[in-house]
Amino acid sequence: MAQLTCQKLCVGYDGKPVLQDLDFEVFAGDYLCIVGENGSGKSTLMKTILGLQMPISGRILTGDGLRKNEIGYLPQQTVVQKDFPASVREIVLSGCQGHCGSRPFYSKEEKKLAADAMEKMQITLLAKRCYRTLSGGQQQRVLLSRALCATQKMLLLDEPVSGLDPKVTAEMYALIQKLNYEDGITVVMISHDLSAALQYASHILHIGDTVFFGTKAAYLNEFPQAWQKGGEVK
């Protein structure tokens, strides 16, 4: 059974669709990269999957034991978020809020979950640092740690390497790949870098003028020019 299924999905704003009749499934352990032109609806799709906005039509179903509150989310950062005056530990712990319910404190288990997430992202030594004093790459590791506190099943990542230099980008991709391969966490990632998507993903969802969903091998078979032209498909 698929963890996530989208059936005849139509998403947009104010009743105006930006993406229509979308069908795809994501299974446990998949690494799906969502690619496409600017304005094609990638971030809108992700927000709709998360329930942050309603679909215009169609269905979004979860299965295989996955509940919507067990999906970790790493959004695109805003300038305000980058200047957030909280400690690294406080931000990572906030990812456990979905487990707390009405309880106004974090349990011992939740604190351990946060500590384990920071260790995986190699930021344990930054726990007491103020978030806004960190580099862009360190901030993204903090936000990924927070997302891990929400789930051990599925991560939704919206441009997780945006604005990072090549070295830090490669390190971030390696950490995400490790979570997928070693921990078995399903990854759904939006990326403008199709060459990276083709390196790491098991499946590709291309939206825009061209709509495609399938395995990486099937994508390369249908669009062989994607690799040759650095991932550009119209």
Question: What are these language model-derived features?
Answer:
Residues 35-37:
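The feature captures the beta-strand-to-loop junction immediately N-terminal to the Walker
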Residues 191-192:
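H-loop/switch region of ABC-family ATPase nucleotide-binding domains
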Residues 130-134, 138:
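Conserved ABC ATPase signature
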Residues 166-168:
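Helix N-cap at the start of a conserved alpha-helix in ABC-type nucleotide-binding domains
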Residues 203-216:
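H-loop (His-switch) and adjacent beta-strand-loop-beta switch element
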Residues 108-126:
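Conserved ABC ATPase "signature" region
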Residues 155-158:
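Catalytic Walker B motif of ABC-type/P-loop ATPase nucleotide-binding domains
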